[in-house]
Amino acid sequence: VTAPLSERSATVTDAVKLQRRAERAAAGRFLAEGPNLIEAAARRGMVERVFATESAAQRYQPLLDGLAVVLVNERAMKLLSETVTPPGLVAVCRQPQITLDEVLAGAPGLVAVAADISDPGNAGTLIRLADAMGAAAVIFAGDAVDPFNGKCVRSSAGSILSVPVVCAPDTAAVIDRLRAAGLRVLATTLDGEATLDDVQGELAGRTAWLFGAEAHGLSPAVARHADRRVVIPMTGDVDSLNVAAAAAICLYQSAYARRSGALG
């Protein structure tokens, strides 16, 4: 039996490099940590290899059946892991490759666009919400976080593997493409000319929701490209919501309208 690899092994150090955005982009690979994410990636044939401590390999033996497993020592696992209490399993996975052209070719009915979102936790939650509400894709536009950042992958709870995710640096160009493809683009802003209640009747149609960054929302220049600027009506002592909360409200309203339209 081969001894577990140490933290100095080239196989381990090469995988650790995937914690960096540039390395992930160059390799087209990302790290999935923990049994739930690895099981979801394995179901889709994305797993290249799984690093496991000896105890984790025993505990999760049925999950690892049929996968390429590399045993590592505890110090190597600490390096590979990005969590406080490592579960003892980290997989190198192939990134799904999908383009905006491919998304639009499918005539999507609901799309979420995240512009300049830098917080990986919010980004992952947005992906999970989009999956739950039946969105056809999530587009990370502008200067946004890498959706395959470890925290984002974990926050998505595996949804990043089931809903198509596209990165596009030019937000205005993305909006123009969405509109040209027949989607109505609604931008969430604090100074919208319409409330979410006002547009409820329009939401059964093909819609792209545009959400801005956590701290300052959408820039006026970007919001101007949308078909409508929409504000979420709020009472109490609250004048803004974080991007995940705003997305949950808007995407649910769209999903509800689409269901009602299908039933009607």
Where are these regions (language model features)?
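N-terminal positively charged helical leader segments and presequences
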Residues: 1-84
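RNA substrate-binding interface of SAM-dependent RNA methyltransferases
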Residues: 36, 97-98, 103-192
